[in-house]
């Protein structure tokens, strides 16, 4: 089957922002104007197409990244609407990994907010080109110019306005297009009566100022244009558009647009900008992957290249298990067998579908650049690579943040026991930031996630989707353990003689602190066969498993590097199990000698309160072991940014309301892990041993 839409006319884009900036409403308007839906759904009415889970429609927030295909001006646009709440950061992360461009939506009143910065950093990590849409221009307090400046200052982006608003708040009437030098007046709030006119005289000076900046930015992308500009020649509309496209795709320019999605103003012009400035799959750098021998290889977005696809999301569905994939090269066909290179297992594609939120359209194949979903994959998880058996390749997986909060769960009745374990397995397959473990001391099932809302929604889903009633304990902090110094030549020796065949395993290791975020790293420097090859893997496995429970308080050990340097074996008595135990013994011994410490999750907390309450808020954050990073006031509103241990933040939502008579708000997101003070460590250790 031949390709129906040329690759250069495909756009894979995401819509991302801080919570409440209007992402889902913007997506709904895009779908309405591109003909996918015939009645506009509203988030506050619980009818948005992309918010299709029950909890999303109830809460008016987007939890999972919904993928939808639509079209605009003979281009196919695949859109992912991502959540803005920090607890669902993995959804944004996995979307960024598979997108070619992003519309970053900002509220014209709130401006650049904490989650806007997080989303921006995620886009930076994957080098995703962006356009900015300053939304809600009809709101009281809307200020396009302030937000434009914040994007430049706080996000350090080369934000170039390609539109200016005509009026704001209740007087927001339309938009000036700085590239075309035309004004668009919206005669009603349905977006159906748009009049193209000359630029209003009172705006001409401002238009001239911003158009000059626009032309300078365009000229800087190309030497020939720069020469033309310096010679005083006018750049044509097409030259400006081509230059802006080049700068946007290179990441050196962020075009800035404005509008009001809710009032249907500016959405069609934004769709034009998606087509004009964001890249096709063939215009982004080829994806890099690893061959089985460890060499790096590039795969271009081309149907004729061998297949390379990344599974970026798993979803339980009444129709079966849906695996969302981005095809980077080649063609993925229904009914074909593919290799899951990450697991080295063959899988069969039984069905392929294109998504229209919770509606789906069966297709025979997905081609290079396509986003779709496959059914029939049993072993594939988020981050796995699917490829041709004859051309194996492993693509870079996703960055999975560590969970920071945990709760114990138990089924309400014995009958729910099996259902609970099935539900937890299914949910953890869908969401890599959701972890499940059984506490070896208490035998309790403990679930961990990115925040209280994250776990609340997962427990809610257990009841709704899996019909499991569960009792949930109080939230617990997900502490970690690590080491502060390196130790050398630590032995682990396991010998057992009890008649018949004995057991013998012996390893010698060096242990040192690893880079933050590396987890457990292992290197073998065995020379001369002191430990045979077949026993190196089991020894590593033993070390890795011992990291699951640290020596101080039983929390997972992270960011350590173990090097196997020596050992010995017995021709008859050595076995894989003996070396696994020896590896575990060496690891425990080494950690005890390497100055182990406990780490706690630190949260970035941003509080906004009326100025009068600023002193109270700062004093309160200090008592919570907070580190104040910045404070500012604007129009009677104080903003305080700090890093605070998660352990001190439970119940803060209630406290801040009572301290500010309900007028304070705050946002909180994970920042990093940090060593706890000695007094706190002693309390944690005593509690873990049952003495507190």
UniProtKB/Swiss-Prot annotation:
One of its GO terms (cellular component) is cytoplasm. It comes from the Bacteria. The keyword Cytoplasm applies. Disulfide bonds: none annotated. Keywords: Cytoplasm, Elongation factor, GTP-binding, Nucleotide-binding, Protein biosynthesis. The keyword Calcium does not apply. GO terms for biological process: ribosome disassembly. Catalyzes the GTP-dependent ribosomal translocation step during translation elongation. During this step, the ribosome changes from the pre-translocational (PRE) to the post-translocational (POST) state as the newly formed A-site-bound peptidyl-tRNA and P-site-bound deacylated tRNA move to the P and E sites, respectively. Catalyzes the coordinated movement of the two tRNA molecules, the mRNA and conformational changes in the ribosome. Belongs to the TRAFAC class translation factor GTPase superfamily. Classic translation factor GTPase family. EF-G/EF-2 subfamily. This is Elongation factor G. It comes from Nostoc punctiforme (strain ATCC 29133 / PCC 73102). The gene is fusA.
